[in-house]
Amino acid sequence: MRKLLAPIAAGALILSSLALAGPASAHNARSHEALAHLSGETHIPPGNPGAGSHSQNMHFRSTIGPTGFTNSDIAFQGRYAYVGNYGGFRVVDISDSDNPVVVANVSCFGPQNDISVYGDVLVVSVDSPLTSPACGSPPASPITLETAWEGVRIFDISDPSAPTFLTAVYTKCGSHTNTLIPDLNDDRLLVYVASYPLRAGPDCGPHDDATDTHNPLHEQISIVEIPLADPAAASLHSEPAIEVPTWDIHDHIGPNPAFNVMRGCHDLQANLGLGLMAAACAGVGQLWDISDPANPATTSPIWEVDRSEIDFYHSALFSDSGKTVIFGDEIIAGTCSTLADGDGQMWFHNRTDGALVSTFQIPRNQGSDYCSSHLFNNIPGVRGDVLVAAWYAGGTTVVDYSNRANPKEIAFYDPTGGSAWSSYWYNNFIYSNDIPLGFSIVHLSDPARAGADRLRYLNPQVQ
């Protein structure tokens, strides 16, 4: 279903390891990985990044190996990759693709440790009530405003080999993901925080106290302001309301008192040139006007899509031309064993009105493995439109969608025992952070990469 809402604008409680094994396995193994991701579980099966299947135009180059934690998102700046995991993050010198070097391994537990960088500033998301924002803090119990913290941590990375914790900002429902927008006119960074109350937090989700006035469904994002002159003075800027439908996980897994219904966003993809944001908000995908980034029009979306075939609007991307908005569906229960079912697809929409153009599913049968689109970005500057995507057990896929009506996989890398969380193109190579296998570098030799732009830095959630 598509709703055109306005003219186009110009220009969780962290779970201990395997805590969900009972509820998830009671449903089926296919949904376990999605529940683990949504709720913060850490489970590391074995695997081999150098083995498995790949297309003739994709070649494994190197890896720095696993961390012992769930590996998550990546940001890039210069010759460094900043590689998140639930236990902290690693800084990797990627100047030699055959011999990446870990120059810093920061131990700072806080799922998901979704990561963004700009200049000397690094931001990580913590979606898990801890006893304090300090690195080394354990999960909080009880979870109250007096005893628990979750939100964003901020580090100084002026010396990439020695990141230094600066400060932290509490945000309601924590921070599942973050989108860092430079607002250089005002000498600051604005960090959009997406979160949701799938599990209750200190002032997030259902509550028993009749005097508590917080909204149990959440229905907001948060914006954190970081002054460039003094990042340690970061603070909560605002809490813009959102208008999205209630998403009920029980529709997908059956009754389970461990999880809450909610209204919130998972990923926020910014296109700064267009002044737009594609908001993936569980039960709906929306397009927002962010031409004034400090005052986004979050309650009056330009359009929204809420297709019943989609389990969970998880992530988004604009084509380089700006003509197309892509939403990724993270399935809660499904596999790629029956490709015709279309579980976990990408959905391609017109940017101007939200009309559906096409969908894409990887063409490789993955049996009973959990298989779903996850995180992705474009290969910038090439002729046509080409993206790189992580597909959990489907590995890393390269998709040519120059013909929007007929997107096609043109390359893939699918390591044994892998489950790709994030896969991105950055300066001539593809970098994948795999849940069990860790960070790997892959080379794409396809002609579709010709002419790709080199970037000074990359936060994949910002274009």
Regions found by a protein language model. Give the residues of each.
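Secretory targeting and sorting signals
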Residues: 2-26
